[in-house]
Amino acid sequence: MISQLNLKNLKFSAALAPKSVSRFCATLVVCLVATGFGTANADIIADRKAGFKGNADSMKAIAAAITSGDYQTVINRAEGIASWANTIPSYFPEGSDSGDTKARAEIWFEFDAFKAKAKANETAALTLVTAAKSGDQGAMMAGLKNLGANCKSCHSNFKD
């Protein structure tokens, strides 16, 4: 990082022409910027993978909680899924389509459709919250099935 460089001890030879210094500086800037973006790209991909893993874990926990009658867990986990769904598009900034990812390029070519899928997932999760608050186990199972269908729909279009 630039903040770690000790520029006071950096000495340039008088033999270095201004053009050479300019080229060096330009190369240094390009390398620093490229490294920073590479790191940011890897971080956002890791973060979104963690979010989707948490989502999958919540789906399993919800299924078990419905069966056991633990409706508060259903509410908490479904609210978490809704919150995650609301933020999903922000985890797919331009340039995060390469690296260790299964995201298809269609996400960025059809970003409005991708955002609509995330919104539908949020709505399905909130519908499940409402069902859990009512205590209607049948409505919860239907809500979980609908939520799963929303997840699958997005995967079909946007994930390899």
Could you say what each language-model-derived stretch is?
Residues 147-158:
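The canonical Cys-X-X-Cys-His
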Residues 2-27:
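Bacterial N-terminal signal peptides that target proteins for export
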